[in-house]
Amino acid sequence: MTENKISSASDTITMYCTQPDLVWDIVDKDGVNYVKQAYITKKYQDTAWVFDTAYKFFRQEAVKIIPKPQEAESPIWMYRDKKWAVPNAGCRRMHLEIPKDELILFDRRTWNKILNMEYVGTDEEIAAFEQEYKRQGVRDPLDIMKSSFYPLLAQKIKKSWQHLFTDPLPEETYWQGAVWYLKKDWVVEEE
């Protein structure tokens, strides 16, 4: 597995993260915060299976890059470009300086494809996969992941998700990052 690392003189990378006020209050009070999987299931309800599937893949691969603390059940997402970290009501955006050895970087566009349960690859690979599933009578590719009728196709989709960790990093505006926890020491300022 190729790690998406960058080189620079600094030991940290500037990132932006939006979280509910409660999370930042915990970080401020306790110095650290970890995400619980139950929060994700509660937040997404009917579509939780999509997030469970994508997050499970991410966790399984991310621990190969940065070991996961026992307290962490899910990663925390952040962005290099603050325009992607838009706070909703009851949330705050923080400017963070994350140590490079704590941060996994990847292309946010690829991650969005994974969250949509899509096949990831070159245009040619995607076209070939589309032909394959259409030959098998699949009209909506989401059905591949929703049902248990297409295990080989689902396996191919999940295998294609490796691109998240093996493709070179794109231009910085598309960098997304993940950490296993948020630390008070990383907060530079509230935006």
Give the ranges of each region predicted by the language model.
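Conserved NAD+-utilizing ADP-ribose enzyme module
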Residues: 5-13, 19-49, 72-74, 84-93, ...
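Short, well-structured hydrophobic secondary-structure segments
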Residues: 50-83
